Amino acid sequence: MTIGIVSYGAYVPRYRIKIEEIARLWGDDAEALKNGLMVYEKSVPDVDEDAATIAVEAARYAMARSGVDPSRIGAVYTGSESHPYAVKPTSTIVAQAIGATPEMTAADFEFACKAGTAAVQACMGLVGSGMIDLGLAIGADVSQGAPSDALEYTAAAGGVACLIGRKESELAAIIEDTYSFTTDTPDFWRREGMPYPEHGGRFTGEPGYFKHVTNGAKGLLEKLGTKPEDYDYAVFHQPNGKFPSKAAKILGFTKAQITPGLVVPKIGNTYSGSCLMGIAATLDQAKPGDRIFATAFGSGAGSDAFSITVTDRIEEIRNRAPKVSELIKDPVYIDYARYARHKGKIRLA
């Protein structure tokens, strides 16, 4: 059975803070940070934006592109590590907002930055089994980094929704196959009640990101019998600009393959939306017949790899909602004081 992406929608808040502004406050070397991270600014949510509102915006854009009746959606799954409620699903909020309730199922997913792709896989399973007609998978975050922590330079806000289906006439992209690689690796964590996550810093790269991304990618390539040169585009999880570039080089993908989907330099790491944002940016410009190789990563740790082929229908739906490039342009820059207010970093005892 053929399963794939019927539609997709992305959302990025319009506010930005430059690396120089954060570095100025903490006395850090902005140029060294920009060169090391390959990130120059990051998105910031408005004071009334959270993972739920971002998920709703992305879902609405996905529905606008699709043109399908929302009552056909049998499942809404939202992946995030910044759900606004500890007990109250984000996914029910989204489902109600797009008119998909009540004859459907919903749940929230968590797996650090790959919760969104985990939701995609769950929807693929339900759609493929025939249990549901369409499934909506979302990755959305308003990620947090403690003041002066290295994460503060990249932790951003944004989200992507993917409508998963099986009717070939409706598919804008076919998901040929998927492969996951998972271990128990404590590279990044946040306990209940902690306002900010903790991490192993520079020592998390090899045992966390690179081990899982390369093994997940190699696993799918071997499963399909394909090679990097068989793909027109490649997308890897983007905690910064340096890691996906290095992963691509290790695996044999070229800079030309990853550049179209590499959005982290302009918006930062959108966590659960990161890999999906790269896929969305790539779908915004891919041609029918193009192949996309994508690998998401989530700390804790695991990776989800996907092989995707774009269909003729992409030309029909692409311009029905804003492209990622359109969401990124014309940002409103703010200083650290306003950033702290937007991010809720100013707390009264």
UniProtKB/Swiss-Prot annotation:
This is Hydroxymethylglutaryl-CoA synthase. It catalyses: acetoacetyl-CoA + acetyl-CoA + H2O = (3S)-3-hydroxy-3-methylglutaryl-CoA + CoA + H(+). Interacts with acetoacetyl-CoA thiolase that catalyzes the precedent step in the pathway and with a DUF35 protein. The acetoacetyl-CoA thiolase/HMG-CoA synthase complex channels the intermediate via a fused CoA-binding site, which allows for efficient coupling of the endergonic thiolase reaction with the exergonic HMGCS reaction. GO terms for biological process: acetyl-CoA metabolic process; farnesyl diphosphate biosynthetic process, mevalonate pathway; isopentenyl diphosphate biosynthetic process, mevalonate pathway. Pathway: Metabolic intermediate biosynthesis; (R)-mevalonate biosynthesis; (R)-mevalonate from acetyl-CoA: step 2/3. Belongs to the thiolase-like superfamily. Archaeal HMG-CoA synthase family. The keyword Transferase applies. Catalyzes the condensation of acetyl-CoA with acetoacetyl-CoA to form 3-hydroxy-3-methylglutaryl-CoA (HMG-CoA). Functions in the mevalonate (MVA) pathway leading to isopentenyl diphosphate (IPP), a key precursor for the biosynthesis of isoprenoid compounds that are building blocks of archaeal membrane lipids. Disulfide bonds: none annotated. It holds the Pfam family ACP_syn_III_C. It comes from the Archaea. HAMAP family: HMG_CoA_synth_arch. Keywords: Acyltransferase, Isoprene biosynthesis, Transferase. Its EC number is 2.3.3.10. It comes from Methanosarcina acetivorans (strain ATCC 35395 / DSM 2834 / JCM 12185 / C2A). (3S)-3-hydroxy-3-methylglutaryl-CoA binds at D29, A30, C113, T154, T204, H237, K246, N269, S299. CoA binds at R202, K242. GO terms for molecular function: acetyl-CoA C-acetyltransferase activity; hydroxymethylglutaryl-CoA synthase activity. The active site is at E81, C113, H237.
